[in-house]
Structures are given as structure tokens and as C-alpha cells.
Amino acid sequence: NIGLSHARGKWIIFADADDFFTADCFTILNEYMDSPHKVIYFNVRFVMSDDPSQESRRGTYYTNFFNDVNPENKLRYQSQVPWGKMIRRSFLSTFHIQFDETRIANDVYFSCLVGIYAPKVTTDRRIIYYCTESGQSLAMSKQDRESLIIRFNASMKCNRLLRQEKIHYYL
């Protein structure tokens, strides 16, 4: 949220510290600089951090969003991460969309709000981002009870909002 308050560009993109962008990422993003859309969803490749040529097990789940008959809705309502998206900064400001102040899963509700309130979105199947996974990755490591409860509550918060908005894509 501190970073969002300091952002000044037309678009926002996110990255985790251990992930990386493709060589042509910014060429691809540049194609959308004058897009009327509020969010552009891009494909992401999931790889092992110690061997980026090896796909991680999370890859199939996310890639299947793009194989769906209607990938926009899958990505809008079931993608719980901020990366792999190009989000118009003015849209985030207008709807006061920020991250939850939790130690984990702070991006789940953020992504849910973005998906629900963006009036105009599009998808691009090209890969712009590599999400790395290791044995210590938060998403893949064994979670303590408190972490599981935080993740569960974040999902329930999204599900309540989706139901309230009469959107039938539950996490």
C-alpha cells in the first residue's frame, strides 16, 4: 500500500522479489499503453527457482485459466495474485483498492476487488512473467494453523463479495 501511494505512472504492474520478467515483457506491455481497458491479464510461466527450465507444479492450474472458454472470467474471479496483470492506476485510486494488512494472503482480496470492479478487461496469452517456486515458497510450504486460518478467511471474504455481486465464480 505504501508503494501504491507513491506510484505515479498510468499503469501498475507487480512482481515478487524472487520472480522475473521475460525479455520481451516491456515490449508487450508497451502495446497496451493506450488501451481503454482497466486491467490486462497476461499469461505467466511457473518454474523452479533452482532450474528455470523446469516447470513447477503450480503452472498447470494458472495456465488452465487461459484454456477456458471464457478466460476473462476465470482470471477476474479466480486469480488471487497481483502479478501477471497490468492495472490502470486511476482505476485502483477510484475504487480505493488496496492490499489487506495481513502477513500472508494480503493480495487475495485485492485481486478479487480488481476482478469485480474493472469494467473493461482483456487477456493476452503471451507469457510476460516467470513465477519461481522453491521448497521455501510460501505457496508450497507447509502452513501453520494461523496461516491456514488467514488464507481461509481471505478466501471467504472474496466469496462473500462475489456472492453479494451475484458472480458465481467461487474460490
PLM region descriptions:
Residues 17-124, 131-148:
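Donor-binding/catalytic cores of nucleotide-activated saccharide
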